[in-house]
Amino acid sequence: MQINTIPVNPTLPRHIAIIMDGNGRWAERRSRPRTTGHRAGVKAAMRTVDFCLEKGIKMLTLFAFSSENWNRPADEVNFLMEMSIKLFGRGIEELHRRGVQVRFIGERKRFDIALVEHMTKAEHLTANNQRLILSLAVSYGGRQDITMAARALAQDVAAGRLKPEQIDEDLLGQHMALADLPPPDMFIRTSGVIRISNFLLWQIAYTELWFTDVMWPEFNSTVLQQALDDYASRERRFGLTNAQIASRGKGSIPA
């Protein structure tokens, strides 16, 4: 499967990005530790992967751990790291068996060496899978993403490999996370919070946004189908007029 030749279905997103929000609050409302919510959140993530495989959605990007999440209580951060290692031990083999390609975006250098090794092994194991590309944003921030891309171009200019006037949106975008994938068609955030929280700031310029009050641990196929039904009813303009969209055809979505 060539990523840039994935057929466009105007009623079904090729690429969904999700902020999995509400694990801690879901647990606290039940007088349980926040870590209980994170465990339930992993199950919700797996349900979402199952749904995407069933529907033929080709790309799913999940915001698992932001660059700002390092400021949370140390015990919660440590739990998330330990849970991640255990997940890679059990879950990756199952994802591989089902044809899921696993990727990670974000700043890995802050993670424990053992966890980074698990990430690398997961990527290598699943690299040739094509049913679904699952990108996990870990220690990721949208501003950080843009800054690193700008820094890379600045280094090329300083080294004489690039002229400043050669820099344009396309070139900057090539240095961003998910550069080889089409931008997300749909962005979903759970828990009733209506903001994008520094997630994929560059990549979601023309993405359809959808918010739900459902907490992430309770997110399921019924809620996700509601999101897809809403998406199918929308007309994506990309800055064009109705007449221009009609002349190009509704399925003409920029890559």
UniProtKB/Swiss-Prot annotation:
Substrate binds at residues 22-26, 34, 38, 66-68, 70, 72, 189, 195-197. The gene is uppS. It comes from Xylella fastidiosa (strain 9a5c). Catalyzes the sequential condensation of isopentenyl diphosphate (IPP) with (2E,6E)-farnesyl diphosphate (E,E-FPP) to yield (2Z,6Z,10Z,14Z,18Z,22Z,26Z,30Z,34E,38E)-undecaprenyl diphosphate (di-trans,octa-cis-UPP). UPP is the precursor of glycosyl carrier lipid in the biosynthesis of bacterial cell wall polysaccharide components such as peptidoglycan and lipopolysaccharide. This is Ditrans,polycis-undecaprenyl-diphosphate synthase ((2E,6E)-farnesyl-diphosphate specific). Keywords: Cell shape, Cell wall biogenesis/degradation, Magnesium, Metal-binding, Peptidoglycan synthesis, Transferase. SUPFAM superfamilies: Undecaprenyl diphosphate synthase. The lineage of its organism: Bacteria, Pseudomonadati, Pseudomonadota, Gammaproteobacteria, Lysobacterales. Homodimer. GO terms for biological process: cell wall organization; peptidoglycan biosynthetic process; polyprenol biosynthetic process; regulation of cell shape. It is an enzyme of class 2 (transferase). Belongs to the UPP synthase family. PROSITE patterns: UPP_SYNTHASE.
